[in-house]
Curated annotation (Swiss-Prot):
Keywords: ATP-binding, Ligase, Nucleotide-binding, Protein biosynthesis. NCBIfam families: gatB, PRK05477.1-2, PRK05477.1-4. PROSITE patterns: GATB. Allows the formation of correctly charged Asn-tRNA(Asn) or Gln-tRNA(Gln) through the transamidation of misacylated Asp-tRNA(Asn) or Glu-tRNA(Gln) in organisms which lack either or both of asparaginyl-tRNA or glutaminyl-tRNA synthetases. The reaction takes place in the presence of glutamine and ATP through an activated phospho-Asp-tRNA(Asn) or phospho-Glu-tRNA(Gln). Belongs to the GatB/GatE family. GatB subfamily. This is Aspartyl/glutamyl-tRNA(Asn/Gln) amidotransferase subunit B. Heterotrimer of A, B and C subunits. PANTHER family: GLUTAMYL-TRNA GLN AMIDOTRANSFERASE SUBUNIT B MITOCHONDRIAL AND PROKARYOTIC PET112-RELATED (PTHR11659), GLUTAMYL-TRNA(GLN) AMIDOTRANSFERASE SUBUNIT B, MITOCHONDRIAL (PTHR11659:SF0). One of its GO terms (biological process) is translation. It comes from the Bacteria. It catalyses: L-glutamyl-tRNA(Gln) + L-glutamine + ATP + H2O = L-glutaminyl-tRNA(Gln) + L-glutamate + ADP + phosphate + H(+); L-aspartyl-tRNA(Asn) + L-glutamine + ATP + H2O = L-asparaginyl-tRNA(Asn) + L-glutamate + ADP + phosphate + 2 H(+).
């Protein structure tokens, strides 16, 4: 049976680091990138006698996330010890939640191929992050950096409702956009503040019994997620087809080889010997707190996209791209306010943000907060076009230069000599040269092939190095060609 005869079944576990200033059970800072083992204390290090104290901001962020995702907020939840040994876990256990998580149920809405679906959530729970093993730092071997130990996490667990890689990526992008809009997570996959484990299984199409699942780790980009799941699905199908059996295990994705490899046998809950954390009381949530947080919820990506489509006439595709990152949506709103709101302006700004600006941001790996171009500058570029100071090709060059340097658009136009030529006398000479060099095309145009006008315009634009005003060039050509 080919792969297409099997149904892929996916469930995702997302670990989202919360944007708190201090860790979940102590006052150590959560900043990324400090020197190894400098953001630590006896609690982080798991020293005997050090007692945890819950950060109230973590609870509020968990409730905010649960409300945004339609979860039931549990009025009483309990922390538990998850016992396992690993060098980056100094206590020998992780403080997490098990039987009584803070949120249950809920879901994430996705759309793939024009079909809308709601992917159910099992639970959301609070837990502490582990440290980090650092390899190749000394000739003697590896080291352990515990700066990350105790950083607060939300683990968001989906039901096995996903049926394709495209659905899995759509789910992650939608969830990431929601968490960023809520201000609880920065969505950074590369730094590991938004990371995902995938439970992958296959079953023959038409079957009702789920196959044995494998958990995949080490996927810090959407591209790696696609590669890892695709490889794992093919591996499982080939194993089943050859008469083998899929073992329940944890597998690590190797991005250099594009394949997964066995890491360890998959543990069940009883292997972790969960029991209630004796050093922390139950988390009690009252109705007043929940209602306050509900009132303070910001506009979520789905509502923002609907507003852009309804009020500004944007296409669903443009709107979804703008709301995929809160920073991009905020930049769009600020540019629209600086330029003047109208459906035409919204479309032009969306085209720039989803086109040239997105390309540059990807090329330079920059998040919106690090862009050197400002909304007022993007609005100024549009006004330069309105005044016919620059044309489309010139605007593209100005956007790139301002994005890279932060220089003012008018200054870039002046220094780079990008001002559009609208003087008929200057353009007429270029038009005459093009027509003289294209006698055959001129004859065919006058014989009825009017589509050649675009060819002539293109040749004149080449002659003027993209600076000719297209409207003036068109008028001159039509006059000289006889309509």
């Amino acid at each position: 049976m080919p792969v297409s005869d099997f149904q892929v079944v996916l469930g995702l576990e997302v670990h989202a680091q919360l944007l708190t200033r201090s860790k979940i059970f102590c006052a150590c800072p959560t900043e990324f990138g400090g020197a190894p083992n400098t953001h630590v204390c006896p609690v982080c290090l798991g020293l005997p006698g050090a007692l945890p104290a819950l950060n109230a901001a973590v609870v509020e962020m968990a409730i905010r996330t649960g409300l945004a995702l339609g979860c039931e907020i549990q009025r009483r939840s309990v922390f538990a010890r998850k016992n396992y040994f690993y060098p980056d876990l100094p206590k020998g256990y992780q403080i997490s939640q098990y039987e009584l998580p803070i949120c249950s149920g809920g879901g994430v809405d996705i759309a793939v191929g024009g079909e809308a679906r709601r992917i159910r959530l099992t639970r959301i729970h609070m837990e502490e992050d582990a440290g980090k093993n650092v390899h190749d730092v000394t000739a003697a071997g590896s080291g352990v950096d515990l700066n990350r130990a105790g950083v607060p996490l939300l683990e968001i667990v989906s039901e096995p409702d996903l049926r394709s890689i495209d659905e899995a990526i759509a789910y992650l992008k939608s969830l990431r956009a929601i968490l960023m809009a809520l201000g609880v997570n920065d969505g950074n996959l590369q730094e590991g503040s938004f990371r995902c484990d995938a439970n992958v299984s296959v079953m023959p199409r038409g079957a009702t019994r789920l196959g044995t699942r494998c958990e995949l780790k080490n996927m810090n980009s959407f591209r790696f997620l696609r590669q890892a799941i695709d490889y794992e699905v093919r591996r499982q199908v080939e194993l089943i087809e050859s008469g083998g059996k899929v073992d329940q295990e944890t597998r690590l994705f190797d991005p250099d080889r594009g394949e997964t490899r066995s890491m360890r046998s998959k543990e069940e809950a009883h292997d972790y010997r969960y029991f209630p954390e004796p050093d922390l009381p139950p988390v009690l949530v009252d109705e007043a707190l929940v209602e306050r947080i509900r009132r303070e919820l910001p506009e979520l990506p789905r509502a923002r996209s609907a507003r852009y489509q309804r009020d500004l006439g944007l296409s669903a595709q443009d709107a979804e791209l703008l709301v995929s990152d809160k920073g991009i949506g905020d930049f769009f709103d600020a540019t629209l306010a600086a330029y003047g709101a109208s459906p035409d302006a919204a479309k032009r700004i969306a085209n720039l943000l989803n086109g040239d600006v997105a390309r540059l941001a990807n090329e330079l790996s920059l998040e919106p907060a690090a862009w050197r171009i400002a909304p007022a500058q993007l609005a100024a570029i549009l006004r330069l076009q309105d005044a016919q100071t620059i044309g489309g090709p010139g605007a593209k060059q100005v956007v790139e230069e301002v994005f890279r340097s932060g220089a003012e658009p008018a200054e870039v136009v002046r220094e780079k000599g990008l001002a559009q030529v609208s003087d008929e006398g200057a353009l007429e000479a270029a038009v005459d040269r093009v027509l003289a060099a294209s006698a055959g095309e001129v004859e065919r145009y006058r014989g009825g092939n009017k589509k050649l006008l675009g060819f002539f315009v293109g040749q004149v634009m080449k002659e003027t190095r993209g600076k000719g005003n297209p409207a003036v060039v068109n008028a001159l050509l039509k006059r000289k060609l006889g309509g």
